[in-house]
Amino acid sequence: MNKSELKPALVFEQFAKINEIPRPSKHEENMIEFLKSFGEAHQLETLVDETGNVLIRKAATPGYEHAETIILQSHMDMVCDKLVDVDFDFHKDAIQTYVDGEWLKAKGTTLGADDGIGCAIELAILASNDIEHGPIECVFTRDEETGLTGAHGMKAGFMTGKMLINLDSEDEGEIFVSCAGGQTTHATFHFSREEAPAGYFFMEASLKGLNGGHSGDDINKKRANAIKILARFLFLENEKLDGSLRLVSFNSGKMHNAIPRDGKIVFAVKNADKEQVRADWNIFASEVEDEFHVTEQTMQFNMSSSDAAPVIKKAVADKFVMALQAVDNGPLTTCQDEAIAWMVETSSNVASVMTDESSINIVASQRSNVMSNLANMTNTVKAAFLLAGAEVTVGDKYPAWKMRANSELTDLAVKAYEKLFGKEPLVKGIHAGLECGLFSERYPELDMVSFGPTLRNVHTPDEALLIPTVEMVWDHLLEILRSVAK
């Protein structure tokens, strides 16, 4: 299979166009202009709100003008991540894709199918002339990945439909009817630097090759967190060296909503201890590799000498390492309802640590399907960093989307799936934030579902789209549109 044979052709044509457009989160200007031009070229009513969300309306197929208006929604931004050795500028370069068996992938970067494929499906609906449907509103929100900015900023009345299909889910055959709420915690350790004592040797330790992944949807997959592993080594080694280890820098993770998959620490130890530290690192690496021998088979531990540099004041560095060792990470509780007892209810992810000349900045993200538990988890993380002397702020929260009893749209979506594929879809919730949570606050009467084609390893350069599932989602969506229209 080559790219010219991908089906539905109209969807993949639109996806190819989208991947020519740089669209990092918070930098969606080119995508907004593309969508405006698309709407105008097809003579469709096109609106852009103050936040930058785009809405394109398409009139009903003749004879279905009085049908219920249905909203199709996706987000226009993408997570930008690449392999370390890949030369790529997400603000200028087009995503380069290739077919690998039944999967569509990108060359060394994120693919942008989250949620570019949702946008492509919407554009294909708008461009098509042979689909039966009632009135449609196609909505493209901005900056979903780094703050749900578009959904936060959307005012009541921008959308007018009473049913909404969100096209930002990642497992074909699953229909999502609820999602977790979330919040981020930001901790900063301020410090001054000093010269290391005489007789110290500088070392660099790095970890790479972890799977990473989405900090909501993948949090229960027993994947390693690079930050927690490196912090664990520093804590253990400093204890073993009677507190003589001196920290220069700690850098790991890039995005608040991804599990960090690589990282690097620079530190100094007494000359007399350097060989012991190397031996300890190798033992530590073997232990961690054994702990994750199923889920992390490509992790790589490296250690080398490093140039001398001013070290962080010891009192601050030690408290920083202790805080990272102590702070909760991973899935913490599962849902109490028996029907979904398998699903993560509350989690936390230490997402990024960045060191500059005078501060260490940490971002951790908390999620829960129960808003009171979200507040408690956020306070738990906050308290750990406050106890260590950090300056802590908490970001805006987004609400959970609660399952709607007697949802007409869920019923339509399930029946359409059964008609097409002869089996029941899985109706479930997701431990990740969807814009549906914010829409449910602004539009409390909105009946919503979320589904999409199968994606793997989102938010990483290994992101992949399962090609056959795109046609399945397309057919499913068209059947729902026909059902609503009739």
Residue ranges and their predicted role:
Residues K7-V11, E345-N361, F421-E479:
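Zn-dependent metallopeptidase/amidohydrolase metal-coordination segment
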Residues M343-A432:
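Substrate-recognition/cap regions that form aromatic- and gly/pro-loop-enriched pockets
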Residues N225-I227, R232-F250, M403-L446:
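Active-site-adjacent substrate-binding region
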Residues E102-K105, E145-T146, A156-R367:
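Midchain, well-structured core segments that form catalytic/ion-binding scaffolds
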Residues K36, G157, K222-K240, A272-K274, ...:
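His/Asp/Glu-rich mid-to-C-terminal helical/loop segments that flank catalytic regions of hydrolases
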Residues N2-E102:
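Acidic/His- and Gly-rich active-site-bordering loop/insert found
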Residues Y64-T146, A151-K162, F202, A317, ...:
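Active-site metal-coordination/substrate-binding segment of hydrolases
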